[in-house]
Amino acid sequence: GDSLYGSHSPTVTSQLGSLCMAPALLMASYQPGVKIEERPLNRMQQTGVKPSLGEDKPKVPGILPFSVEALMADRKPGRDRDLSSPTGSPLAGTSHSPRVGSIAAGETPNSPISLGNRYPVGAIMQLPEETLLKPESPERSSWIQSPSFSPSPTRRMSPPACPLRKHKTNRKPRTPFTTSQLLALERKFRQKQYLSIAERAEFSSSLNLTETQVKIWFQNRRAKAKRLQEAELEKLKMAAKPMLPPAFGISFPLGTPVPTASLYGTSNPFQRQALPMSPMGLYTAHLGYSMYHLS
């Protein structure tokens, strides 16, 4: 007899091939993100062959996330669908009222609002006013009033403390020296600014003072003498500065006597006009002079 495949016509052979390809095409239709070409299914419909596996399961065409159909239908992929439900436990710190774009309590997941769209324009327009959070509602501004988001209050800049010199509370009172004691101390200081231990003990006993009082007085007197001497030297430096630049000088012809009138600025038709000058002896000073030196 003839073989199984040899006795059939080419039409029957193509029908059997379509039946073999049908399960693979149906399995590919369940893969997410894969769009099925309609050409093999059209061939099956034209030949009249109906797949046995496709009768009990509905056809779910997959849509790519960036395809034209997904953009026109305003959809997102299945993994980004809204997972929030009324029975789900809310996160800690979030409000229990429904937010804009979420599923309301009385709606089902199959409602037009919950088609995987978080913020569709049509769904927001169809929501009742009670589900929307108004700007003045306390639930909307609760996170703003929380201490973690509220800015810290500006600290007032306290005025800087006045740096006043505070004396110690246990400071000893100032020693009131008499006039005779001050004169004796000044006389002794002009003789000798530094006293030995024996001299200080003898001198303090003669003035009815303690050695510490005499020592402190001599220390203060030496500091005062140093300040006065520095002030005198500063005055001498200021007075010694010439009125003219150092490179500028007045020259006279050699062998001719210097007229006295030219030093004081008097006019002479045969001599140059001289600038007024003070006598040279005014600037001479004994820098080594000591004001406490006794002659």
From Swiss-Prot:
Q: Where is the composition biased (Polar residues)?
A: 84-97
What Pfam families does this protein map onto?
Homeodomain
The protein here is known as Homeobox protein XHOX-7.1
Q: Which organism is the protein's source? A: Xenopus laevis
The UniProt entry, under PANTHER family, shows: HOMEOBOX PROTEIN MSX, HOMEOBOX PROTEIN MSX-1
Where are the compositionally biased (Basic residues) regions? 164-174
* UniProt keyword terms in alphabetical order: Developmental protein, DNA-binding, Homeobox, Nucleus
Ranges of Low complexity composition bias in the record: 141-153
